[in-house]
C-alpha cells in the first residue's frame, strides 16, 4: 500500500499541481521584483532631482534680480485693459496690461498615425490590445458592443491573463524549478535501489567526474516536466515543441553562443571553411528576391531552394589567358572548364524521385574523358545535397571512397579522370594552404562565376587563378552543382510567337471580363519540371505567372509584357488592358525600362513603381475634418499618389472595422480577396482624401511587379489648390451615416 501511494504522488496529477504552484510562485516573485525595481528607480530619480534643484538654487542666489518695468498707463494701447495687483503686505501696487486674444477656430481632430511611403504587411492581432473608449453615449446606445468586440478576439485581452500567461523567461524558470523535483525523485529511487545498483551508481559517478570538464551543464529536464506544462498551457505547444523551445532558450543564454545557422565572420579571426549554403544562409533568409531588399516587410515568405539558382552566367570567360602563369596554359585545363560549362548548360537527366544513382563498381570500365568525370562528380554531389535530409551516412561513405580512390596512386594512373591528373609530364600542383575564409569565399563565388577562375582569383585577391583552378579540381566532388533551368521546349518561331501573342491578349480580356470581382493575391509558383496546368497555384488563383515564378520562360500562363511603342495609356496596350503596370524587365520597347531619365519616360503606365507622385498639401477640409489638396495642376488620368498603409487579412479587417464603424471614421481599402490596406495607423497623406459621389479622382487596384497596389488618378483636369475627392463606394445607407456634407459642385 505504501508503494502504491508513493507512485500515485508522482503521477500526472501531482505534476500538474507542482506546475500550478511553481507558476504562481514565480509570478508572485516577478511582481515583487518588479515592484522593487520601480521603487529603486523612483528613489534614484528623486535623488537626482533634489541634487539638480540644489544646484539651481545656488545659482539663483548668486544672480542679481533684474527689476521688472511696470507700465504706468495702458489706456493708449488698443485691445488692452488695465489690471492691478495688490497685496495685503507692504508691497507696492502693480499695474499690468491685459491683452485679449481674438477667437481662433480649432483645428479638426486628428488621431496619431505613422507616415509610410510603401505598404507594410502585418500579422493578425489575435489579442485585443486595449478596450477602446467610445464615449458614454455610444455605450448607452449599444451596451453589448464591448462584449461582442471581446468575443471577436476569443476573449483574449492584453493584461487579462494572470493564469494563462507564460513568456520565455517564466518558462525557463518554471522548467528549472520543476527539475529540482525530478532530481529529488531520482535520488529517492536511487536510495530505494541502492543495494541492487551500487556498482552501477559508482560507475556512473566515475563517468560524471570524467565528463565534468566537457559537460559542465546539468542534464536535460525530464519529459514529464514538459508534459505537465503542456497540459496546463496547451496553447504553448506539445511536449516535443516545448523541449525544443527550452533547448533554444537555454543555448541563447550561454555566453558567446551563436545561432545554429550563424557562421563566424568571414573577415574575422574565427572564420571557418563551410559550404556555400551555410555561408549564404543569412542572404537567402533575409534577402527578398521580389523587391531586392533585406528584411522585407511586404513579402514575408521564405524562398524555396529553387529560387537560389542562377539562370545566366555573371561573367563569361573570354578564353584569353590572364598572364604567363594563367591556369589556361596548363594541359587539360581548357577541357576541364569546357566540361564544366557544357554540363552547367546541359539539361539535367530526369531520374525517378526517391532513387539514388548507384556508383559503378571498381571493375567496370568507364570512359576517361573530363566531361564524363564532371558529370559523375556533379551527379554524385547533387545526390549528396539531396541526401542531407534522408541519407547522410551513405553520402559520407561515398565521399570516403572517393578520397581513397584519389589517394591511391596505382588506381589514379589507371582510372584518372580529372584534367589535373591527365598531365604526367608537367610540374605537380602547388601545395598551397587555403584559410577557412578563402575556401568559403571560393565556394560562394563558384556558384556565380562557374569556370571563370581568373575572375574568382581577382575577387579573392590572395590566390592566383592557377591555385584557384587546382583547388576547384580538388573540390569537384564536394561543391554542389548549379543546375540550369530545365527547358523542354525548343525556341518558338516568329510566326508562332505572333499567334500565341494574339491568343494571350484575348485571354487577358476574358479574364478581365469574367472574373473582375475575383482578384486573389499572387504567390510565385514553384513546381519543378511540372507544367502550369490546373494544379498550378497561379492558374487556380486566376493569376498570370510572373517573372518570379519558377516555371519555364516558355510557360503559356506567363505574362510576356507589351511591345508598344507609344505611351501605354489606352486599351491597345495589353498591360493597360490587364490593369497592370508595364514591367521594365518584360516591356522593353515602350520606355518602361528607361531608367536614366525618370521624369521624361515615354511610357505612362509605370508611375506607381517609379513613385512619380504629385505634391500634396494637408489642410482643414470644407467637407469633414482634414482634407488633401493638390499643389500643381494635373491632367485627366494622370497619376497622383499611391494609397499606402498596413496590409492586413480580411479577418483582421473585419475585427478592426467594427471599431472604426463606431468611430465613424475608416481608412480600410480592399486590395484583393485576401488582403486589405488599412491606413489608420500607418499611411501617407492621400489617406485624408474625403468621399464624394462626384469626385475629381478615382482609385484603381493595379498589378505592379507581382504586387497589388492602389493608385489614385485624376478623373478630370484638376487645378492648383483643389481638394481631392474619390468615391469610397459606400452603400446609400453608409454614405448617409459617414458623410453628412457633400461638397458644392463648381459651375463652369
UniProtKB/Swiss-Prot annotation:
SET domain residues are 614-729
- Compositionally biased intervals (Basic residues): 347-359
Bias category Basic and acidic residues: which stretches?
Answer: 376-387
Q: PROSITE patterns per the record?
A: CXC (PS51633), SET (PS50280)
**EC number in record:** 2.1.1.356
Chain intervals for the UniProt region annotation (Disordered): 184-221, 342-428
Described purpose of this protein according to its UniProt entry: Polycomb group (PcG) protein. Catalytic subunit of the prc2/eed-ezh2 complex, which methylates 'Lys-9' and 'Lys-27' of histone H3, leading to transcriptional repression of the affected target gene. May regulate the circadian clock via histone methylation at the promoter of the circadian genes.
Name of the protein: Histone-lysine N-methyltransferase EZH2
Species name: Xenopus tropicalis
Starting at the broadest rank, the lineage of the source organism is: Eukaryota, Metazoa, Chordata, Craniata, Vertebrata
Amino acid at each position: 500500500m505504501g508503494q502504491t501511494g508513493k507512485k500515485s504522488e508522482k503521477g500526472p496529477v501531482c505534476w500538474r499541481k507542482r506546475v500550478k504552484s511553481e507558476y504562481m510562485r514565480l509570478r508572485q516573485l516577478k511582481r515583487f521584483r518588479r515592484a522593487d525595481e520601480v521603487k529603486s528607480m523612483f528613489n534614484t530619480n528623486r535623488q537626482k532631482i533634489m541634487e539638480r534643484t540644489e544646484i539651481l538654487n545656488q545659482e539663483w542666489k548668486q544672480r542679481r534680480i533684474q527689476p521688472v518695468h511696470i507700465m504706468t498707463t495702458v489706456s493708449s494701447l488698443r485691445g488692452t485693459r488695465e489690471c492691478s495687483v495688490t497685496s495685503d503686505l507692504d508691497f507696492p501696487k502693480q499695474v499690468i496690461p491685459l491683452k485679449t486674444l481674438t477667437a481662433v477656430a480649432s483645428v479638426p481632430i486628428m488621431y496619431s498615425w505613422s507616415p509610410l511611403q510603401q505598404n507594410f504587411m502585418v500579422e493578425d492581432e489575435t489579442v485585443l490590445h486595449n478596450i477602446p473608449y467610445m464615449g458614454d453615449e455610444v455605450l448607452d446606445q449599444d451596451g453589448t458592443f464591448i462584449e461582442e468586440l471581446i468575443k471577436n478576439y476569443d476573449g483574449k485581452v492584453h493584461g487579462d491573463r494572470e493564469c494563462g500567461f507564460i513568456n520565455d523567461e517564466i518558462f525557463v524558470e518554471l522548467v528549472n524549478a520543476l527539475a529540482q523535483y525530478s532530481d529529488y525523485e531520482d535520488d529517492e529511487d536511487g536510495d530505494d535501489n541502492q543495494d541492487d545498483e551500487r556498482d552501477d551508481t559508482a560507475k556512473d559517478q566515475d563517468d560524471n567526474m570524467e565528463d565534468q570538464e566537457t559537460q559542465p551543464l546539468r542534464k536535460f529536464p525530464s519529459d514529464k516536466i514538459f508534459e505537465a506544462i503542456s497540459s496546463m498551457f496547451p496553447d504553448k505547444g506539445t511536449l516535443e515543441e516545448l523541449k525544443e523551445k527550452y533547448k533554444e532558450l537555454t543555448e541563447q543564454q550561454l555566453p558567446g553562443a551563436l545561432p545554429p545557422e550563424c557562421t563566424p565572420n568571414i573577415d574575422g579571426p574565427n572564420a571557418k571553411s563551410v559550404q556555400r549554403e551555410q555561408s549564404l544562409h543569412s542572404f537567402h533568409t533575409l534577402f527578398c528576391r521580389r523587391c531586392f531588399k533585406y528584411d522585407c516587410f511586404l513579402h514575408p515568405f521564405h524562398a524555396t531552394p529553387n529560387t537560389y539558382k542562377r539562370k545566366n552566367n555573371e561573367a563569361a570567360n573570354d578564353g584569353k589567358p590572364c598572364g604567363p602563369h594563367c591556369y589556361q596554359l596548363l594541359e587539360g585545363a581548357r577541357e576541364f572548364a569546357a566540361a564544366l560549362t557544357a554540363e552547367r548548360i546541359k539539361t539535367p537527366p530526369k531520374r525517378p524521385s526517391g532513387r539514388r544513382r548507384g556508383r559503378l563498381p571498381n571493375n567496370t570500365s568507364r570512359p576517361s574523358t573530363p566531361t564524363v568525370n564532371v558529370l559523375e562528380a556533379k551527379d554524385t554531389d547533387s545526390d549528396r545535397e539531396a541526401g542531407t535530409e534522408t541519407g547522410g551516412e551513405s553520402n559520407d561513405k561515398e565521399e570516403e571512397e572517393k578520397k581513397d580512390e584519389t589517394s591511391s596512386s596505382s588506381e589514379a594512373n589507371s582510372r584518372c579522370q580529372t584534367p589535373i591528373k591527365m598531365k604526367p609530364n608537367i610540374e605537380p600542383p602547388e601545395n598551397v594552404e587555403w584559410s577557412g575564409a578563402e575556401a568559403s569565399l571560393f565556394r560562394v563565388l563558384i556558384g556565380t562565376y562557374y569556370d571563370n577562375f581568373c575572375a574568382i582569383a581577382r575577387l579573392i585577391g590572395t590566390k592566383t587563378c592557377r591555385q584557384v583552378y587546382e583547388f576547384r579540381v580538388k573540390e569537384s566532388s564536394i561543391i554542389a552543382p548549379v543546375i540550369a533551368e530545365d527547358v523542354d521546349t525548343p525556341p518558338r518561331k516568329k510566326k508562332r510567337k505572333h499567334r500565341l501573342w494574339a491568343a494571350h491578349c484575348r485571354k487577358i480580356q476574358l479574364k478581365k471580363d469574367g472574373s473582375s470581382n475575383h482578384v486573389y493575391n499572387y504567390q510565385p509558383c514553384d513546381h519543378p519540371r511540372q507544367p502550369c496546368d490546373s494544379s498550378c497555384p497561379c492558374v487556380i488563383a486566376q493569376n498570370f505567372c510572373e517573372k518570379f515564378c519558377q516555371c519555364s520562360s516558355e510557360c503559356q500562363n506567363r505574362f510576356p509584357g507589351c511591345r508598344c511603342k507609344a505611351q501605354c495609356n489606352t486599351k491597345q496596350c495589353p498591360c493597360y488592358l490587364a490593369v497592370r503596370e508595364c514591367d521594365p524587365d518584360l516591356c522593353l520597347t515602350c520606355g518602361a525600362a528607361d531608367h536614366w531619365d525618370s521624369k521624361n519616360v515615354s511610357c505612362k503606365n509605370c508611375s506607381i513603381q517609379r513613385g512619380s507622385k504629385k505634391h500634396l498639401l494637408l489642410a482643414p477640409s470644407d467637407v469633414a475634418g482634414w482634407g488633401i489638396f493638390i499643389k500643381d495642376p494635373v491632367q485627366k488620368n494622370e497619376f497622383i499618389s499611391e494609397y499606402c498603409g498596413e496590409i492586413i487579412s480580411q479577418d483582421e479587417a473585419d475585427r478592426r472595422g467594427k471599431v472604426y464603424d463606431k468611430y465613424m471614421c475608416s481608412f480600410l481599402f480592399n486590395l484583393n480577396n485576401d488582403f486589405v490596406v488599412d491606413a489608420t495607423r500607418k499611411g501617407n497623406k492621400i489617406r485624408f482624401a474625403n468621399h464624394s459621389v462626384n469626385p475629381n479622382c478615382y482609385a484603381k487596384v493595379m498589378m505592379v511587379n507581382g504586387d497589388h497596389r492602389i493608385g489614385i488618378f485624376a478623373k478630370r483636369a484638376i487645378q492648383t489648390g483643389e481638394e481631392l475627392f474619390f468615391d469610397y463606394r459606400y452603400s446609400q445607407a453608409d454614405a448617409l451615416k459617414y458623410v453628412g456634407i457633400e461638397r458644392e459642385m463648381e459651375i463652369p
